[in-house]
Amino acid sequence: MNKASGGDEIPVELFQMLKDDVVKVLHSICQQIWKIQQWPQDWKRSVFIPIPKKGNAKECSHYCPVALISHARKVRLKILQAGLHQYMNHELPDVQADFRKGRGTRDQITKLQWIIKKARKFQKNIYFWFIDYAKDFECVDHNKLWKILKEMGISDHLTCLLRNLYTSQEATVRTGHGTTDWFQIGRGVHQGSILSPCLFNLYAEYIMRNTGLDKVQAGIKITGRNTNNLRYADDTTLMAESEEEQKAS
């Protein structure tokens, strides 16, 4: 999917052939977008490809819509991603391992194994609740997202640029039977966009903060530390020493 062309159908090989010439043009376009905080309308269009998941192929819910976007737009999004990472490193807690340099799912699995091992050593009960958000990327409310970014200290200029990207965005769905008419998208972040995991992680972090988990006593208390959740993107593991403790939190 990374090499697939977007709605403009310009292949990545053309960018590779033009080399320095295309770099100069893209640099100029990206600078202009940043300056005026507006995007070319073609860059706000996405082609969605339904990728089948496990289950009944006749059910729409068993497909994951992945967005194909232009390679020129990907370059600009990559630059914005670098800017967002600076805020993510400051705002996201250690319990969140997604998009953290040098960390991944193995780290979270290792932590769970360590917690279980220590719980056995100190003869503690341990209960885990595994949560996976349904249609996570699709349910992000845009207006709430912009407010969250502002509350987290992300610059007004960057937030405005992101908001304008999602304003009046259009999409079409392409299948083996053809392509639909263009339609407006009013909510959600794109599957397949490099910015989407960043935006969703900040959105989910705000939700977790408002649960008050950081203020409750529920969790596993080992070697003086209290841990009540571990996260990797939208996969969240809650933990406590009893069912009652978790319900109370």
Where on the chain are the PLM-derived regions?
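Catalytic palm subdomain of template-directed nucleic-acid polymerases
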Residues: 135-152, 229-249
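Structured loop/turn residues at secondary-structure junctions
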Residues: 71-72, 225, 241-242
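Active-site palm subdomain of RNA-directed nucleic acid polymerases
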Residues: 83-96, 199-233
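Conserved pre-catalytic core of RNA-dependent polymerases
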Residues: 1-203
